A protein has these predicted regions:
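Terminal targeting/low-complexity segments that flank the catalytic cores of oxidoreductases
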Residues: 1-91, 114-121, 136, 140, ...
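Amphipathic, well-ordered alpha-helical segments in soluble domains
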Residues: 43, 70-77, 104, 149-156, ...
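Short amphipathic alpha-helical segments with heptad-repeat character
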Residues: 65-68, 72, 95-98, 102, ...
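Amphipathic alpha-helical segments within well-ordered protein domains
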Residues: 78-82, 95, 158-161, 174, ...
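Carboxylate/His-rich catalytic cores and anion/metal-binding grooves
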Residues: 87, 93-116
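Active-site-proximal alpha-helical scaffolds that flank and shape metal-associated catalytic sites
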Residues: 110-184, 211
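Secondary-shell segments that build the walls of catalytic and ion/ligand-binding clefts
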Residues: 155-156, 165-227
């Protein structure tokens, strides 16, 4: 009796990019205990009267609160992607992303605990979270979360790090800029695979999703809690210019995926 021939191995070379980001994520893994908690001040230390110092702490606490809020939502989104992805290479990657977002949340919780606890929530960030979680297709979830949001948020980490030299906050922002760069790169790699044979109607839904997301992201980027209202007014023109540059870059990324971006409506 002759042995049954083994089935030909499926060609998985299209997923090589996703696997590369899985390996990179494993290489870059860090632990919350690695953060220099006892060696550096949590945030820049203010000078002047106790009242002035307390106001300065409130400003930094509001910055940390926004990042904590974003990463709590990101935990849900990453878990949803892990559950939704059918491909083993993507599931391997998303298993690391779930760990990353949980680690980020733990670190932000520790940091904000040293600044007096949680503060005012950003309503636009909550709206973005609902938009991501309620997206209908895997293509849309990856597009909104990793292709757009993760990429658009990286410059903010770099900006916060530059403004908080020699602190735990700077250390965390530098770590998260690297992690989110990997999340974004993996999302680009996986979205290319997902869109390679996707029908035009799926691609059209991504443009519709971008048009829903971009105004909300702009509102989120420009929103300031009460603790930062005055600073926000002083820096609004610069913030708008920076945001415009970032959104244009996001549109170029969408175009690089083979999407027709002519119908994307920028909020500026």
């Amino acid at each position: 009796m002759s042995a049954e021939p083994l089935p030909a191995e499926e060609d998985r070379s299209a997923y090589a990019g996703v696997l590369r980001f899985y390996e990179l994520a494993k290489h870059q893994e860090w632990a919350v205990r690695d953060v220099p908690w006892g060696e550096l001040p949590p945030v820049p230390e203010g000078k002047g009267s106790p009242h002035r110092q307390a106001r300065r702490i409130d400003v930094w606490r509001s910055v940390v609160m926004q990042q904590l809020q974003a990463d709590v939502l990101a935990c849900e989104m990453a878990a949803q992607l892990l559950n939704a992805a059918p491909d083993p290479e993507a599931r391997l990657y998303y298993s690391t992303m779930v760990q990353d977002e949980s680690r980020h949340t733990e670190a932000w919780l520790k940091l904000i605990g040293r600044l007096g606890g949680e503060g005012e929530r950003d309503p636009h960030l909550d709206a973005l979270g609902h938009m991501f979680l309620e997206a209908d297709t895997l293509e849309e979830k990856v597009f909104l979360m990793q292709v757009f949001f993760e990429r658009l948020i990286i410059p903010r980490f770099r900006l916060i790090a530059r403004s908080s030299r020699g602190t735990v906050l700077e250390d965390l922002c530098n770590r998260l800029a690297i992690d989110d760069g990997i999340h974004h790169g993996a999302g680009m790699a996986y979205e290319r695979v997902l869109l390679e044979h996707a029908p035009q109607r799926v691609k059209n839904t991504l443009i519709d999703a971008a048009n829903r997301m971009l105004p909300e992201f702009a509102a989120h980027a420009l929103w300031r809690p009460k603790a930062r209202e005055m600073i926000g007014h002083l820096m609004e023109a610069r913030d708008r210019e920076r945001l415009k540059t970032e959104l244009n870059h996001g549109v170029r990324l969408a175009k690089s995926l083979g999407l027709d971006v002519s119908d994307v409506q920028l909020p500026f």
